[in-house]
Swiss-Prot record:
Binding site for ATP: 115-121
Pathway noted in the entry: Cell wall biogenesis; peptidoglycan biosynthesis
Name of the protein: UDP-N-acetylmuramate--L-alanine ligase
Superkingdom of this protein's organism: Bacteria
GO cellular component, one term: cytoplasm
Gene that specifies this protein: murC
One Pfam family cited in the UniProt record for this chain: Mur_ligase_M
InterPro entries for this protein: Mur-like_cat_sf, Mur_ligase_C, Mur_ligase_C_dom_sf, Mur_ligase_cen, Mur_ligase_N, MurCDEF_pg_biosynth, UDP-N-AcMur_Ala_ligase_MurC
Entry GO MF terms: ATP binding; UDP-N-acetylmuramate-L-alanine ligase activity
Keyword ATP-binding assigned: yes
Amino acid sequence: MSLFRSRQAKIHFVGVGGIGMSGIAEVLLNLGYTVSGSDLRESETTRRLAGLGGHISYGHAAENVLQVDVVVISSAVKRDNPEVLEARRRKIPVIPRAEMLAELMRLKYGVAIAGSHGKTTTTSMAAHLLAHAGLDPTAVVGGKVNAFGSNAKLGKGDYMVVEADESDGSFLRIPPTIAIVTNIDPEHLDHWKTPDALRRGFVDFVNRVPFYGLAILCIDHPTVQSILPDVEKRVVTYGESHQADYRAEAIELSGHAVRFDAFRRDEALGRFEVAMVGRHNALNALAVIALGDEMGIPPLVTREALRSFQGVQRRFTVRGEVAGVTVVDDYGHHPAEVKATLQGAREAFKRRVVCLFQPHRYTRTRDLMAEFATAFNDADVLLLTDIYAAGEEPIPGATAANLAEAIRAWGHRDVTVVPRAELARAARERIRPGDLVLTLGAGDVTAAGPELLALLER
């Protein structure tokens, strides 16, 4: 305890280049801790951490943990990882990333954003609002926030804004003072087993709020609404529903922005604008409006903060335009995210949409095959590529070809399966001047956009 409090502890992260691990490592480095980490390959993230003073190793080896006091792992780290085995042999504590995040949050008032979709954007907006309001928050986000140039920020204020990860149940380790839930969809059932267990997990997460805290819940989402009777702490709701405590009306989708009127019950708070695409981002912004209002931040300050929000990398990021073809990249990989992103693309650009989609994980493809089958209706052309395994083993019946067959069966007229290495070339053959090309998925499909732009520039 004295080592951690005196900041003399040597903390090692296995898989430090991961988006969830790197943010915590960066905050600890900025606090003055000795931080080391390992990853399989060098990346922009590991280079950034090394530049901040982190000791980064490539490859996993027992000698990486010989001089450390604690080892931090994510759920992606296998039990037989040599660093984990050596740490346990030496009786060095091995803890999940959420436990380390919780230790940082104990020093602050925690604002934790959870949900199946939209939590990275909402977390980023919330951190930006608190910064704009002069509260100088610490933030750990599951994506690179453009205004921070990173997925983490160390602040001197009393608040810490974090993205809460439900995928492995680890959000039940963190102590939020304010909890926001954007939505709850059946996802990560490899961990939760049943949708009801997932729902119960969110109830437990919200009930971790202290008696003086607050839960901010999206009443528009039926599963979120269903947890209201089980929540034992103070709740405010938000959404388009007339039953919402904070309500959005007159939503306008125009180009790269969404505008709407916000109300606190029957009191008008004003018209707000955020430079994000898609109706769903009106609700993400509304959650932040509710947060600001409940914290006593004037609506005018919130309006200015949302208007100046610069977004998050890989959340509808325009990668470039060549020969009249615009290339956009997005992280969406769940059917609900895919559907919302494609709808937003069509509404914002009003062009023909060519979608390059890479399924993420065999389990997700298998479990959500039926939902994926109807998620691509707003794509005029769909190029499907190989499943990004994310460490999983192949599952019979869960392939890109199986997914393409399901999408065609539900009526899509233009679906083609293309190997990842040939994706950019295949896209070049299909596009026309004026098209919007959307690379979509949580894997390395993000690189296909620059590859296509390079081909178009030749």
